[in-house]
Design a protein with these regions (language model features):
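A glycosyltransferase accessory/donor-loop signature
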Residues: 1-14, 166, 171-323, 335
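Short, acidic, metal-binding catalytic loop of nucleotide-sugar glycosyltransferases
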Residues: 28-37
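Short internal beta-strands
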Residues: 39-47, 136-138
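Active-site-proximal specificity loops/subdomain of glycosyltransferases
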Residues: 59-100
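Short Gly/Pro-enriched turn/cap motifs at secondary-structure boundaries
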Residues: 87-88, 157-161, 192-194, 226-227
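Short aromatic/hydrophobic "clamp" motif used to bind/position activated sugar donors
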Residues: 108
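Catalytic metal- and UDP-sugar-binding loop of GT-A-like glycosyltransferases, i.e.
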Residues: 111
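Conserved donor-nucleotide/metal-binding helix-loop-beta segment in metal-dependent transferases, i.e.
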Residues: 115-148
């Protein structure tokens, strides 16, 4: 690895509406960081205002630097292909560009903005990933919610306890580049439109069997049963609609507000909570129901992703696709004009 332990690159991705929550996450990270380490904070964006950038720059200190990185050039090639849904925005795809945008970086942390960091992120960065593409934690929604667990097994072909949440990743940028992860994503994108967890599904397919599983304390989702003791939590993740700035009874919201109070956007965030209407909360409930129905519909589809691959019916007008079946995996060999590589799209299947 090129980076030294005393200089850690950390990436967020957000827009102008969400950057205030990024600031809360960053504040919590700073509160628990080592004074012996330098942290380089990158914010990937397309439209954050100068006013909000100034507020975040003001958070810099002797150990933390902040820079805003515009991703328009990298987003342009996929903009028309990105399927959007409800609370998803194009920012969710930005993490895929990190390795290519920053060729000098061999390892980086990506973290969602709807998080609170309660441990030293340097300890997370210190994990040896080996040749894994990412270090990640298991997605608890897939493990604890039957519909979503069935979805990943019947639509993606990934066992529910081998599916990771992409809201906190230690990215092995060197392996991303070496194994053309961004290129694989771009090849998968037009082949099948994943509508449930979108880029998280693509990442789980591409990175299957190339994951360094990290202790669950590094991505504790506010959902169902918490997989560790509260005092052990290092990263708290307010997933889906469970946002403390929308719900005063959000579980574990006290950690968010403790950090929010220290930021220059505290009053603004409190106003968001106070002005969030019952109608908006109803829409949240509808959104959750709709997402679950999408998962059920995908499971029931005859031409869902897994069924198409099994039948050898995935097609792309720009490339020749051949299915290769053996007892351990189904692979798709993609023969392009410029290169030939094999992309493992379906993991080992139980029969």
């Amino acid at each position: 690895m090129k980076e030294k332990m005393n200089k850690i690159p950390v990436f967020y991705a957000c827009d102008d509406n969400f950057v205030k929550y990024t600031m809360v996450s960053l504040q919590s990270m700073m509160d628990h960081a080592s004074k012996e380490v330098q942290y380089e904070i990158h914010v990937l964006h397309t439209n954050i205002s100068e006013e909000m950038q100034k507020k975040m720059y003001a958070m810099e200190n002797a150990n933390f630097s902040v820079q805003f990185d515009h991703v328009t050039e990298y987003l342009h090639s996929v903009q028309e292909k990105l399927p959007l849904r409800d609370y998803y925005s194009k920012t969710t795809y930005f993490r895929l560009f990190i390795a290519e945008m920053f060729p000098e970086i061999d390892k980086a942390i990506y973290i969602d903005s709807d998080t609170v960091v309660l441990g030293d992120i340097a300890q997370l960065y210190a994990y040896d990933l080996g040749d894994a593409y990412v270090g990640a934690c298991k997605e608890q929604v897939m493990i604890q919610e039957e519909v979503y667990g069935t979805y990943v097994e019947k639509v993606l072909g990934v066992e529910r306890d081998n599916y990771f949440n992409a809201g906190m990743l230690v990215i092995n940028c060197e392996q991303f580049r070496k194994n053309h992860v961004l290129e694989q994503f771009m090849e998968l994108l037009p082949m099948y439109n994943f509508v449930v967890t979108q880029d998280e599904d693509y990442l789980n397919l591409i990175c299957h069997n190339k994951v360094c599983w990290l202790p669950q304390k590094w991505n504790v989702e506010v959902f169902g049963q918490i997989p560790c003791r509260e005092e052990e939590i290092c990263v708290l993740h307010y997933i889906m609609v469970s946002k403390p700035w929308h719900y005063s009874d959000c579980r574990l919201q006290e950690y968010f507000w403790e950090s929010a109070e220290k930021t220059s956007v505290y009053a603004e965030i409190r106003q968001v909570l106070e002005s969030y209407t019952d109608e908006e909360r109803k829409r949240d409930a509808v959104s959750c129901d709709r997402l679950m129905q999408m998962a059920k519909d995908e499971i029931a589809k005859e031409n869902n992703y897994l069924n198409l691959v099994k039948a050898g019916k995935l097609k792309s007008k720009d490339r020749q696709i051949t299915t290769i079946v053996n007892i351990t995996e189904i692979s798709i060999k993609i023969v392009c004009k410029a290169s030939v590589h094999t992309m493992v799209l379906i993991p080992p299947l139980k029969v």
